[in-house]
């Protein structure tokens, strides 16, 4: 744990910035709502927690803290215990779930475990207080996280939806929203917040392990981009945000188009062949999403769009172990 000794300021430009953002989106964190904040103890989540606690007097939120101990290093239990003690001193309710590397060994496993645990904790809080259900889960993702996610998904060949995946809010489950209030803050700014407000920071050694792809991007790729083009991290994050807006517009237009293309069994192939290859790919992506099918890469969507085009024969394409797309002269169907 690191700590500074400066005098805390009651209201800063950081408070004002978040306050203005929340006022412009009143449904993001509604007045008087119950909030469950995921706190690792690192600079981003501690900065978020402090700002939320200071704004609490204006919004009258009920704040709860959740911590996930992955057990990936020897200090993880100590970090959890010290964070719990700090939260108790702040008179905050604190909840902790623990796992280990045998159960959660990859970045994706860890992310899925965290969200599953957060959803369960939110449900428990709602059950304990039906009059004040916990419908908002907060994380300390920043502009840097969005840039790293963008680069990872770009390298993997993600479609537009994948490139705009880290959003300010999204639905985790019915009546439970994931909110990222400081997504427009940079990591440089969160460390400044922690320094100015005398906040403790717990350093997670696993964050420096470049065996994990996100850490490798953070340690090796981002510094090169910044040396070539200073502030590129923020510009890439802003691009991802614009793509999010574009994807939402595309989502609405695709739904309108699907209304004319849907049949009792799937999609009308004769109508689909009249569209351009690019538009077919957009429609297919939306159709698959609506049917809760796995997200295909841009390359897979282009390949599928090409195969169902004009003057192409019948065929099929596996999209998971238990799901395939089959098409004939008249229709395009999902087959289990």
Curated annotation (Swiss-Prot):
Q: Can you state which reaction this protein catalyses?
A: cytidine(34) in tRNA(Ile2) + L-lysine + ATP = lysidine(34) in tRNA(Ile2) + AMP + diphosphate + H(+)
Residues reported to bind ATP: 40-45
Segments crossing the lipid bilayer: none
What EC number(s) would the UniProt record show? 6.3.4.19
Q: Gene Ontology terms, cellular component aspect?
A: cytoplasm
Q: Name one GO molecular function term.
A: ATP binding
Uppermost EC category: ligase
- InterPro entries in the cross-refs: Rossmann-like_a/b/a_fold, TilS/TtcA_N, tRNA_Ile_lys_synt, tRNA_Ile_lys_synt_N, tRNA_Ile_lys_synt_subst-bd
The protein's UniProt keywords, in alphabetical order, are:
ATP-binding, Cytoplasm, Ligase, Nucleotide-binding, tRNA processing
Recorded hits in Pfam families, A to Z, give: ATP_bind_3 (PF01171), TilS (PF09179)
Q: Listed disulfide bonds for this chain? A: none
GO BP annotations listed: tRNA modification
Query: Where in or outside the cell?
Result: Cytoplasm
PANTHER family, per this entry?
Answer: TRNA(ILE)-LYSIDINE SYNTHASE-RELATED (PTHR43033:SF1)
Q: What is known of its domains?
A: The N-terminal region contains the highly conserved SGGXDS motif, predicted to be a P-loop motif involved in ATP binding.
Q: Which family does it belong to?
A: Belongs to the tRNA(Ile)-lysidine synthase family.
Q: What does this protein do?
A: Ligates lysine onto the cytidine present at position 34 of the AUA codon-specific tRNA(Ile) that contains the anticodon CAU, in an ATP-dependent manner. Cytidine is converted to lysidine, thus changing the amino acid specificity of the tRNA from methionine to isoleucine.
What is this protein's record name?
tRNA(Ile)-lysidine synthase
């Amino acid at each position: 744990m690191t700590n500074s000794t400066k005098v805390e300021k009651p209201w800063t430009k950081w408070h004002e910035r978040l306050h203005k953002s929340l006022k412009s989106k009143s449904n993001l964190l509604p007045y008087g709502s119950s909030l469950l904040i995921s706190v690792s103890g690192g600079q981003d989540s501690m900065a978020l927690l402090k700002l939320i606690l200071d704004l609490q007097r204006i919004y009258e939120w009920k704040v709860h803290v959740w911590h996930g101990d992955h057990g990936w290093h020897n200090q993880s239990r100590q970090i959890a215990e010290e964070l719990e003690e700090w939260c108790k001193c702040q008179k905050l309710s604190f909840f902790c779930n623990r796992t280990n590397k045998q159960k959660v060994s990859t970045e994706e496993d860890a992310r899925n475990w965290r969200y599953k645990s957060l959803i369960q904790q939110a449900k428990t809080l709602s059950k304990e207080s039906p009059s004040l259900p916990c419908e908002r889960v907060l994380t300390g993702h920043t502009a840097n996280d969005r840039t790293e996610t963008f680069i990872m998904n770009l390298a993997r060949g993600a479609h537009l939806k994948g490139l705009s995946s880290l959003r300010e809010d999204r639905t985790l489950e019915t009546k439970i929203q994931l909110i990222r209030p400081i997504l427009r803050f940079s990591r440089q700014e969160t460390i400044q917040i922690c320094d100015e407000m005398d906040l403790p920071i717990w350093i997670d050694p696993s964050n420096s392990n470049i065996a994990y792809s996100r850490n490798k991007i953070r340690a090796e790729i981002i510094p090169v981009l910044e040396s070539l083009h200073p502030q590129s991290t923020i510009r890439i994050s802003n691009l991802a945000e614009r793509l999010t807006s574009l994807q939402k517009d595309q989502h609405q237009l695709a739904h309108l188009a699907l209304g004319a293309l849907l049949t009792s069994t799937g999609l009308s192939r004769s109508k689909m062949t009249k569209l351009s290859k690019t538009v077919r790919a957009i429609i297919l992506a939306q159709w698959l999403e609506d049917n809760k099918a796995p997200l295909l890469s841009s390359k897979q969507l282009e390949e599928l769009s090409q195969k169902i085009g004009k003057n192409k024969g019948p065929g099929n394409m596996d999209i998971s172990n238990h799901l395939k797309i089959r098409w004939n002269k008249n229709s395009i169907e999902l087959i289990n």
